[in-house]
């Protein structure tokens, strides 16, 4: 069972993205209702999502609200993973964005440990890291996020490439090993796949 906190996309759009990925039907076709001949694949994808017990929230904005929902679901029937898309969109009480980000990152880390759930937290990349790539993580609030997370994976597009990217495992607290995984982006499904 899993929860997705979609702080950027509305729930129906996030669901369509998942269905498109699982059914291999272009998002545009699903959005436009042009699904003739694909109904079985779409229904199969919807059934798979239901079997996962996956819920998508698009109306939860603060770390306290996220933690409350996670605790509720964990107590009511178990929970395996939590995904947040994306951490910089979590609203906080402080006027300082970095203090809010630090609090959110630490709370996600505590929640994972205390409730024994895997958390996947997406982050934006800051503009400076795109212009001047370095060994730094290049995420907005990278220091706060890096200190709280067990693993950090960065997607990076090689210079001049539109559809190829690499997943760089920059931090791996549990296993220690780091490295690159070659990937490809499919614009039709908004999907990232392993590059052969």
Q: Predicted regions span which residues?
A:
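Residues immediately C-terminal
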Residues: 89-92, 154
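Short amphipathic alpha-helical segments
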Residues: 16-18, 95-96, 132-134
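Cytosolic-facing regulatory segments adjacent to core modules
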Residues: 1-78, 92, 139, 180-187, ...
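Conserved ATPase-coupling elements of RecA-like P-loop NTPase cores
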Residues: 91-99
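Walker B beta-strand of ABC/ABC-like P-loop ATPase nucleotide-binding domains
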Residues: 82-83
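Walker B catalytic acidic pair
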Residues: 86
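Phosphate-binding/switch region of NTP-binding enzymes
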Residues: 103-196
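Feature marks short, surface-exposed loop/turn motifs that line or immediately flank catalytic pockets
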Residues: 11, 90, 126-129
């Amino acid at each position: 069972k899993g929860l997705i906190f979609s702080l950027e996309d509305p729930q129906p759009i996030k669901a369509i993205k998942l269905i498109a990925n699982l059914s291999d039907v272009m998002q545009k076709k699903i959005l436009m209702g042009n699904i003739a001949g694909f109904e079985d694949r779409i229904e199969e994808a919807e059934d798979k999502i239901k079997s996962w017990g996956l819920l998508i929230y698009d109306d939860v904005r603060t770390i306290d609200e996220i933690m409350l929902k996670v605790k509720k679901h964990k107590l009511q029937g178990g929970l395996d993973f939590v995904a947040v898309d994306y951490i910089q969109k979590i609203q906080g009480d402080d006027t300082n964005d970095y203090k809010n980000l630090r609090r959110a990152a630490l709370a996600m880390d505590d929640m994972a440990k205390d409730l024994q759930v895997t958390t996947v937290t997406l982050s934006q990349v800051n503009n400076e890291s795109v212009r001047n790539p370095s060994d730094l993580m290049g995420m907005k609030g990278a220091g706060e996020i890096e200190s709280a997370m067990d693993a950090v994976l960065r997607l990076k597009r090689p210079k001049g490439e539109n559809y190829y990217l690499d997943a760089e495992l920059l931090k791996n607290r549990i296993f220690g090993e780091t490295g690159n995984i070659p990937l490809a982006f499919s614009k039709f499904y908004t999907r990232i796949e392993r590059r052969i």
